[in-house]
Amino acid sequence: MIVCPPKYRTFLSFCFAAFFALGAQAEPAEFTLLDVQGVKHKLSDYRGKWVVVNYWATWCPPCLTEIPELVDFHEERKDKDAVVLGVNFEDISPNALKQFSEEYFMNFPVLRTKPGPNSALGPIPGLPTTYLVSPEGEVVARQVGPVTAVLIADFIAQQITK
């Protein structure tokens, strides 16, 4: 896990919140995607928990940098209040993606979708792009660029105290 020095944590948390927060939606977000095992995952299956939906690709260096952060976050929170869904955003065979996810010890569901400018949650202007979905199914935040476990946890904590 990457550790942020305390003197920068408040500043980074503020920047993360400023660039990450989105306005309210009319309806809960929804998608259904297959994982590397061929199992369907519906976003609504995770209602009641925060869902970190991370769009990434195997060829994307910043994506690879944040994988350990997402693994740590998922491991720490999956049985409590939050999960990570990794959505692979490239044309890659299911077997190659499965092997990659095993090599990187990805402990969260690795889903597949076809690349394009948009997703079910909103635009994908670059990779990685991470959306945060509230326990009620509302997309509350988006971050383009890498995230850390601490920044995600801090943002969720801020949302809970609102």
What are these regions (language model features)?
Residues 12-21:
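Bacterial N-terminal signal peptides
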Residues 49-51, 55-59, 126:
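Short pre-active-site segment immediately N-terminal to redox-active cysteine/selenocysteine motifs
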